[in-house]
Amino acid sequence: MNTMVEDTGILRPMRRSHGSGRFKRSQFARIGQNVIIEAGVLVFHPETVELGDGVYVGHGTILKGYYRGRMVIGDGTWIGQQCFFHSAGDLSIGRNVGIGPGVKIITSSHAEEGISKPILHSRIQTAPVVVEDDADLGVGSVILPGVHVGKGAQVGAGAVVASDVPPYAVVAGVPARLIRTRTK
């Protein structure tokens, strides 16, 4: 039986859950060789998730696939413990990306619709996130919808990234700002 929720005075059925997050490797859109998925990882909509060869996913991480988005994680990428990735708006992570523990990557947000209704009940808008090859996302950083992190870029611990990061840039802070550019 569906639970009823009130939305602006009208009762409507609550949408079904996306499931428990439990998964089988055979459910993934693609899973490469030598993939390590630690205990306690939850994967929602694994049929929309692709993991390349040699990907590591740390314990307690949530890969929140979405029925109409794709999540693609490239070969050799390392995902630390207790990360949260949401791919309603498509998420593409390149090869050999280092992702520290507790990183959040979000591809959706609530649309601004004024104060006539609660934010929770506003439309969901999506925007893809791209993290290019060889980038590094520091512990606890947050990547917001629509952001493109360039090749070899480095995001500092705890940074909130709301705009694009150029290739080989080092950014940090809230909001994230350019600190320097990496050189050979």
Predicted regions and their residues:
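C-terminal/domain-terminus segments
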Residues: 148-172
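Serine/threonine-rich low-complexity intrinsically disordered regions
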Residues: 7-9, 24, 133, 151, ...
